Amino acid sequence: MPASISRSTYASMFGPTTGDRLRLGDTELVIEVERDLTTYGEEVKFGGGKVIRDGMGQSQRTRAEGAMDTVITNALIVDWTGIYKADVGLRDGRIAKIGKAGNPDTQPGVDIVIGPGTEIIAGEGRILTAGGMDAHIHFICPQQIEDSLHSGITTMLGGGTGPAHGTLATTCTPGPWHIGRMLQAADAFPINLAFAGKGNASLPAGLEEQVRAGASCLKLHEDWGTTPAAIDCCLSVADRMDVQVMIHTDTLNESGFVENTLAAIGGRTIHAFHTEGAGGGHAPDIIKVVGAANVIPSSTNPTMPYTANTVEEHLDMLMVCHHLDRSIPEDVAFAESRIRKETIAAEDILHDMGAFSVISSDSQAMGRVGEVITRTWQTAHKMKVQRGRLAEETGANDNQRVRRYIAKYTINPAIAHGLSRHIGSVEEGKRADLVLWQPAFFGAKPDLVLLGGMIVCAQMGDPNGSIPAQPYYSRPMFGAFGGALHASAVTFVSQAAEEDGVGERLRLQKGTLAVQGTRDIGKADMKLNAHRPSIEVNPETYEVRADGELLTCQPLAELPLAQRYFLY
């Protein structure tokens, strides 16, 4: 006879199931399990007296006969594709199957085989997400990588060579020599990396050599001169060589206004950085480009969300990041032209509408590399508090809003940069770059981070304890060391560099993967974030209107996922 147990008892044993709801951290966001791919009464769980034992939930099948390398049991997947419960099977560093795990010789409906060679990660009561992608990195110091990884980011894309002044201001790794050195340096780090070449040139040869050297994308930055000629040249090279172009437009409007920049872009695909404008771009109306079909608009996290301290801290940050001098009036005016509370407030709302598609950091150059994920969920919380439930929500949950916001740092930057065949979502065939969270710590402190199917960092207690005793904090694990590091992480390069054998030429120890499909995409390809409102900015008051509606909200004085989570 089947046994019946209460929902609370079931959830404590196997995690929440269809119809159960849970809160994300200390936010006002509540998710509901949409479906459950496991089978009631046939759930697998590891431990003393539990199911995954020889002849029970564990079969006799070898790896050659289809047994998984690792199975994550009973995980609650939170992804742009949905919010659902499943077992997840990993093989060869990728997601092999999402479904029902167990022993097909003793259990019905098993499509994920557990064998003697299978490791188990207990996902009961935990949330599983794709590893995050930060697509706006100034590689100013290598220590950024540790902070980023331990926050749940598994892929970093950007440019730089260290604390050189070009890197402090712009996300470019200029020239074949520097690109080669950064590709070699990437071998040391347990994270996926990709590098941007400098895109500011009026003739193509200097850009083409950077793409052939291994640049996965090109960056146009106003500090190097983002003129119409440079924009056109860079995009022409990108179209021929299939790499993405990121743009930081002309704050001073020296070589044209936002309309001139859009004309120079000419309908070609481009990723617009910090599209609100505080991070740089045509003042005061760069935010207009969120309505363009060919522009992928993104935010950097210092303005996300709009709080009581946002405006005050920005002026000092900007003076430092762009090598400005307070004694020069023109430098001060340049800085002040970029900080507008009206456009910063509108940015939150445009994210909630799905008009901004991506959130990234702008690491150490007005952004915080370890806070991309936290600030994304703080913004989602703020918008629920201030705007209420989304009209498209069904049921007593925030699933649609949660799916929209998680897409901003997972699938959408991956699509924008030609990486979505490999990363960006919890889907079969993609790399097993995954993050497990305790729901109470969701968005603040990951429990486990997997890279290529191996644990690279985790919350861990005293190594000298008889058990892993408190205090717990995130520490590097075995996947972050030795040859395992090189087998788990990859470096993304251009197709031209991959075909030229860049890995062998530079004797890289990490594998390389080519970016692909960056030019025939646009705003419509941004998952759950493809809205294209018509934006108008009042040049005197800076008020922002979308399709005629005034966009304004108040700054928050207190946020979730903040001080109470970071005592140590």
Curated annotation (Swiss-Prot):
Cofactor stoichiometry and binding remark: Binds 2 nickel ions per subunit.
GO molecular function, one term: nickel cation binding
Cell compartments where the protein resides: Cytoplasm
Chain residues that bind Ni(2+) 1: H136, H138, K219, D362
InterPro entries found in the cross-reference section: Amidohydro-rel, Metal-dep_hydrolase_composite, Metal_Hydrolase, Urease_alpha_N_dom, Urease_alpha_subunit, Urease_AS, Urease_asu, Urease_asu_c
Reactions the enzyme catalyzes: urea + 2 H2O + H(+) = hydrogencarbonate + 2 NH4(+)
Annotated positions of the N6-carboxylysine modification: K219
GO cellular component: cytoplasm
Source species, domain of life: Bacteria
Entry binding sites for Ni(2+) 2: K219, H248, H274
Main location: cytoplasm
Entry keywords, A to Z: Cytoplasm, Hydrolase, Metal-binding, Nickel
Alphabetical GO biological process terms: urea catabolic process
EC numbers, comma separated: 3.5.1.5
One family name in Pfam for this protein: Urease_alpha
Pathway the protein acts in: Nitrogen metabolism; urea degradation; CO(2) and NH(3) from urea (urease route): step 1/1
PTM (free text): Carboxylation allows a single lysine to coordinate two nickel ions.
Signal sequence bounds: none
Main enzyme class: hydrolase
Binding locations of substrate: H221
Annotated ranges, domain Urease: 131-568
Cofactors, names only: Ni cation
Matching HAMAP family: Urease_alpha
Subunit architecture: Heterotrimer of UreA (gamma), UreB (beta) and UreC (alpha) subunits. Three heterotrimers associate to form the active enzyme.
Family note: Belongs to the metallo-dependent hydrolases superfamily. Urease alpha subunit family.
Protein name in UniProt: Urease subunit alpha
